[in-house]
């Protein structure tokens, strides 16, 4: 029992470190005199990205008992693959809501902190990858090889620290966002390739990568205010008119939502049929 659980303890501790370590390291790495101000900007903007963290956390509590109840059969593997696809689709839909309507969400924080909004999409994408990593993590739990979880999480944490050490002196709090993305991305890659050797699950990788590609393409096409710094400091479309920005970004969101509905039209048709069947009929 101890052999199974102690790596999970390390896994949990490292997971907490991945969430807070960048903020702990920042004061020691940032060379500017405005360190507290910069850290405050980053911390405030991360609050918006916590929308994604709440989604992934709720998913974790609901999904883990379902997987362990299903065991290690082929049907369970197919269910895990299907859930992974829908998890990515739903979280990317939430990502599109936030980035397309940042003009609305930015009022959650003070106007003085708006310059840090360019970190929000990166932090949100890191949270999505954290959820993907959680989905991938069941292979070592079901095969009683939990030490892999501790090893991979430690490597991911090391990548986060390395990115922060190298980039915080150069690009400030943006390095914290990129460090989280790099750390979780490393964990995802390690868990997928190692896991497929020990516990093969037929994840629809091309479809998942396609949804990421579509979401990122629409993200780069979104409209921003003229005075807003984008993630890469060169927004493609800047409109002065708020309503024009919202209308244009709504169109981009509609493209993504329509693509989701079209790809899952058979499922949507079945769900709508069941809902309509439950409606009271006029006599």
Report the location of each language-model feature.
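Specific pore-lining/lateral-gate transmembrane helices of multi-pass inner-membrane transport
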Residues: 41-153
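Membrane-proximal transmembrane or re-entrant/amphipathic helices at the cytosolic face
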Residues: 223-283
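Hydrophobic alpha-helical transmembrane segments in multi-pass integral membrane proteins
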Residues: 11-18, 96, 161-165, 215-230
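Interfacial/gating helices of multi-pass transporter permease domains
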Residues: 1-4, 8, 26-50, 114-117
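Interhelical loop/hinge segments that connect adjacent transmembrane helices in multipass membrane
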Residues: 1-19, 62, 66-75, 198-210, ...
């Amino acid at each position: 029992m101890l052999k199974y659980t102690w790596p999970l303890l390390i896994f949990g501790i490292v997971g907490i470190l991945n969430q807070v370590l960048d903020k702990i390291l920042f004061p020691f790495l940032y060379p500017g005199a405005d360190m507290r101000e910069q850290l405050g900007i980053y911390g405030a903007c991360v609050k918006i990205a916590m929308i994604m963290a709440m989604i992934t956390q709720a998913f974790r509590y609901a999904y883990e008992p379902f997987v362990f109840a299903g065991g290690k059969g082929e049907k369970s593997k197919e269910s895990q693959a299907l859930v992974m696809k829908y998890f990515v689709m739903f979280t990317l839909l939430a990502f599109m809501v936030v980035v397309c309507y940042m003009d609305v969400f930015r009022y959650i924080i003070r106007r003085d902190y708006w310059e840090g909004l360019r970190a929000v999409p990166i932090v949100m994408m890191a949270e999505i990858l954290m959820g993907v990593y959680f989905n991938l993590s069941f292979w070592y739990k079901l095969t009683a090889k939990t030490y892999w979880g501790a090893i991979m999480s430690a490597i991911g944490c090391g990548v986060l620290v390395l990115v922060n050490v190298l980039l915080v002196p150069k690009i400030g709090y943006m390095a914290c966002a990129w460090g989280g993305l790099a750390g979780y991305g490393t964990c995802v890659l390690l868990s997928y390739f190692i896991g497929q050797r020990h516990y093969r699950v037929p994840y629809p990788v091309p479809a998942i990568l396609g949804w990421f590609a579509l979401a990122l393409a629409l993200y780069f096409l979104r409209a921003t205010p003229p005075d807003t710094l984008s993630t890469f400091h060169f927004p493609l479309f800047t409109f002065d008119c708020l309503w024009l920005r919202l209308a244009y970004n709504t169109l981009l969101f509609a493209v993504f939502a329509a693509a989701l509905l079209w790809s899952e039209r058979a499922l949507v048709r079945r769900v709508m049929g069941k809902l309509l069947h439950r409606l009271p009929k006029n006599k």
